[in-house]
Regions:
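ATP-dependent carboxylate-amine ligase
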Residues: 1-165
Length: 165
């Protein structure tokens, strides 16, 4: 057990997460510092479940957590069923500030408990409005979606320039 404790404190904490796979950044938007959790590299049922569970388990007040979910793509005729599987998981979390983008996630949004709903975004540029109009300084925003949704490009813009507006 001493070896495990050593690895935990000296090795694993030094591992840098790959961009888009759970890495965190502090970004500045409209004079607000936002803690961005970037899960935007891709999305599939397992990685989405893991990201939601990890975000939910953070020791942060639930009203400080914002989650933006984009579609999981390339699921073929299983798409609707696999998107619907996430409804029960989202409803079981303490996360109340939920935003979605994309056709499949918009359908999921309609089936969520009323107190989980925040808004459906129609275009990626509305993320700025989400941050400016709804978030406070030091709030947390997790973004998760498939590459083809374009969320990863937007997140890279946020992280690269540190100020979008």
């Amino acid at each position: 057990t001493n070896n495990i404790k050593f690895l935990k404190t000296h090795t694993f904490q030094k591992i840098k997460l790959v961009d888009g796979r759970g890495d965190t950044s502090k970004i500045k938007v409209d004079n607000k510092i936002i803690n961005l959790i970037d899960e935007s590299y891709n999305s599939n049922p397992l990685s989405l479940k893991s990201a939601i569970n990890n975000f939910n388990s953070l020791d942060i007040k639930s009203d400080r957590k914002y989650m933006l979910l984009g579609d999981m793509l390339e699921l073929g005729f299983h798409s609707e069923r696999l998107h619907n599987q996430v409804i029960k998981l989202i409803n079981s979390t303490s996360i109340k500030n939920l935003y979605v983008i994309g056709g499949e996630m918009s359908k999921v949004f309609k089936k969520l408990k009323y107190y989980k709903k925040s808004n459906v975004l129609n275009k990626i540029s509305q993320i700025n409005d989400l941050i400016i109009n709804n978030m406070n300084n030091n709030d947390y925003l997790m973004i998760k979606g498939s590459n083809a949704t374009g969320l990863n490009k937007y997140v890279n813009l946020l992280k690269g320039f540190k100020s979008v507006l």
